[in-house]
Amino acid sequence: MQDFSNLVEEVENTLIPYFRKIEKRALFNQEKVLNAFHHVKASESDLQGSTGYGYDDFGRDHLEQIYAHTFKADDALVRPQIISGTHAITLALQSTLKNNDELLYITGSPYDTLLEVIGINGNGVESLKEYGVRYNEVELRDGRIDIPKVITAINDNTKVVAIQRSKGYDQRPSITINEIEQAITSIKEVYPNIIIFVDNCYGEFVEDKEPIEVGADLIAGSLIKNPGGGLAKIGGYIAGRQDL
């Protein structure tokens, strides 16, 4: 029994540096969120909700300002009517892509649920494809963004370059914020007007920076995941440039 106790202690001591790193990052991001609450002067009255009369909902307005400030975005849309991350991503793509525009995913194929949104799977009804949006993708190279191939794949019709930050259900590594920054910098040097969209699901607060801080124009995610702290049953957000 003593040998087992020693083994447990040895393993715990081995893991201490990793847990300290996680705790440090958690405190950093907690401070960032608290600073956002302070910046917008959120108060108890914001938690009272709305009766439905009138058009003003200060609690909702402040919540969206908090998200915008936290993610370093111009503006944010945070609503329970956005029921999931897929819904948020769909809204972001539909708002930026029109007939004959091309959507280019540079992290390989997205989630299965998004394949129906794009029009690759399913009956195509109300999909991007039905509205004349083209689709192309660039596979990862050894689990990383193949930047030279991405630059080559972009054409005159490419309107949005999309990055899926999380590995999702694949076996590949998730895309780090440093890698996202390298890809965005390289793309923007050649195509400064292209829109960079990042699917930020599962990626919020796992690093010190968020995609907008490294050049992304638009991000979207789910409140059911990291931002909801495991408490939210529904909701999603979109954040980024105000003109988008």
Q: Can you describe what each PLM-predicted range is?
A:
Residues 2-16, 23, 33-39, 43-46, ...:
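Conserved PLP-enzyme active-site core in the AAT-like
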Residues 26-30:
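Acidic, PIN/NYN-like endoribonuclease modules and their adjacent C-terminal/linker elements
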Residues 47-77:
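Active-site-flanking structural segment that lines cofactor/substrate pockets
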Residues 77-78, 136:
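Structural signal for short hydrophobic segments within the conserved structured cores
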